[in-house]
């Protein structure tokens, strides 16, 4: 926990909401949602928990400890709140089962030195995209899609995937006005049937 605090301070200072380079939330309503949710866990905030509604900046906020069934870990936060769930090694499988039964997230990140376990975990969950021992970098990889799944959004974007997702192909045929395809018209004699059977092969 202390290392996490140090990392935040190193990046954006002890009062990040006063840092000019620190980004703001998209709108006043978004700021209020984050501030209100943080306030519900005021007694468990171990870092942050402050901001400026005027600038719409809210500091990265660590909330600990949080239970896996508490409201804050059952929805996408879309803000700088980090709830931390404590668990024991022998509780990991049960925890993953709980996660897999919920709405699928846009991203899924795990940190481990065990490659075999990492592969097993990544294959056991559904998510838009993910990383092992990293965050967000999968969004920057050229030539692969960025996508959601279920509640986090359907479809894939970036490159050719984005083009296909946001376009709708329509087939249009220009017919000749000077000739008529009599083959398709009644009566269907033997000659027409033979020709049609060749077209259909």
What residues fall within each predicted segment?
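Generic structural signal of hydrophobic/aromatic residues within well-ordered alpha-helices
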Residues: 4, 22, 195-199
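Flexible, acidic loop-helix segments that line cofactor/substrate-binding pockets
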Residues: 5-36, 50-57, 74-79, 142-143, ...
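Conserved C-terminal structural/oligomerization subdomain of aldehyde/semialdehyde dehydrogenase
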Residues: 9, 58-201
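Basic phosphate/pyrophosphate-binding loop/patch that engages nucleotide-derived ligands
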Residues: 36-42
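Conserved small-domain helix->loop->beta segment predominantly found in fold-type I
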Residues: 43-53, 65, 69
């Amino acid at each position: 926990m202390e290392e996490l605090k140090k990392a935040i301070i190193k990046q954006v200072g002890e009062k990040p909401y006063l840092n000019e380079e620190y980004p703001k939330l998209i709108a006043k309503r978004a700021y209020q949602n984050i501030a209100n949710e943080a306030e519900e866990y005021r007694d468990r905030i171990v870092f942050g928990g402050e901001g400026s509604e005027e600038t719409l900046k809210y500091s990265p906020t660590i909330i600990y400890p949080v239970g896996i069934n508490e409201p804050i870990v059952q929805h996408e936060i879309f803000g700088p709140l980090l709830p931390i769930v404590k668990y024991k090694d022998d509780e990991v499988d049960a925890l993953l089962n709980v996660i897999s039964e919920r709405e699928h997230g846009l991203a899924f990140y795990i940190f481990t030195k065990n490659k075999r376990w990492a592969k097993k975990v990544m294959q056991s969950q559904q998510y838009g995209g993910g990383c092992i021992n990293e965050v967000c970098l999968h969004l920057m990889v050229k030539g692969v899609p960025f996508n959601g799944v279920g509640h986090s959004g359907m479809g894939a974007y970036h490159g050719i995937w984005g083009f296909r997702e946001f376009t709708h192909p329509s087939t249009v045929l220009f017919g000749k006005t000077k000739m008529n395809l009599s083959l398709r018209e009644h009566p269907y004699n033997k000659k027409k049937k033979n020709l049609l059977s060749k077209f259909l092969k």
